[in-house]
Amino acid sequence: MKPILFSLTLVFTTLACFAQDYYGNNRKQWLQKAEQYKPKLIITEKKPLKVVDIVPDTQSFQKYKAVDVSPIDSLYSMPFRLKKEITIDFGEHLTGYFSFSVRSTGLAADGPLRFKLTFGEVPSEVAVPFDSYKEGLSRAWLQDEVVSVMYVPQTVTLSRRLAFRYVKIELLGSSPYYDFNIHDMKCMAQTSAKNIPEELPQAVDPMIRKIDRVGLNTLKECMQTVYEDGPKRDQRLWIGDLYLEALGNNYSYKQHDLTKRCLYLLAGLSDLNGYLLATVIENPVPRAQDKQFLYEYALLYNVTLKDYLEATGDMETVKDLWPVAKKQLDIVRTNVKAD
């Protein structure tokens, strides 16, 4: 019996090794085109506006609000060692890399500093400790970092890309023999959205205009080197988010090369049997999440390709990707009954 099982295993393994790639040589050129249309990120230096206190408020979203304390310059001239904790407000939501500088005041620094930085999109995120978080998603997604500054003066740039408006800075450790300032805090905000969408007419209801501005800013921050499903968590391309964000882009930023890149990337990283996988993780190298085929997402890829054609008239790209769209229809048809 064992020799028979071994022989069968060997046969199936051999067949798998020689399995045909449904898209053949197309896959390589699709990935090359995806790389060709990878956008350059636009980097903008943003600085905090003010120091705030986060206080409970039953009428505010998630029961916390930010109350203005002082302009940011007041923090930069203040000895920080006895202050211990402070929260700053950038005045807008940003996606990018945060940095700050420290310098001693008076006596030379004779020891390192240690800070805890907590980043929040809304006031409640920096007000409520993360300690009680029960993991559903990875705890590592929560935006807090412990930073040790071994030498003063020094500029520290966090390696992690963050999505935030508020930053809470807590001093965890310092020498009692010198004091220091924190200064020159900034975020190098990034997006691939370079065009400026048209504003809604003044006659439109002010609330609708405000919703439109927030929606456009959200889309802008999701437009990185792919359409991310969220710049704070997950940070990857899903077909469902591609459909929604590309549709919004068609009527706002109109940067269709980003849509083209995503369409080619998904095609190039599809399963060997032609199935489109629902999600692509871009870094450190693009790769698809295996065995994640969703029928509705496969069809949304086709809808996105159609929307792209209507927005651009780019028939060459559509013909290039037609085998992918056709295959998704064939796959779905095999699982749909006549009724």
Where are these regions (language model features)?
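Bacterial Sec-dependent N-terminal signal peptides
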Residues: M1-D21
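Extracellular/oxidizing-compartment recognition motifs
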Residues: Q20-D229, D257-K260, N273, A278-E282, ...
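C-terminal capping/lid segments that line or modulate ligand- or cofactor-binding pockets
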Residues: K28-L31, E35-P39, D234, S252, ...
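Short, solvent-exposed loop/turn segments at the edges of secondary structure
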Residues: T95, L162-F164, G240, E296-L299
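Helix-terminus loop motifs that line ligand-binding clefts
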Residues: E125-L137, H256-D339
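Amphipathic, well-packed alpha-helical segments that form the structural scaffold of globular domains
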Residues: L216, K220-Q224, Y243, Y264-A267, ...
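Extended ligand-binding clefts on enzyme/binding-domain cores
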Residues: Q235-L244, G248-Y253
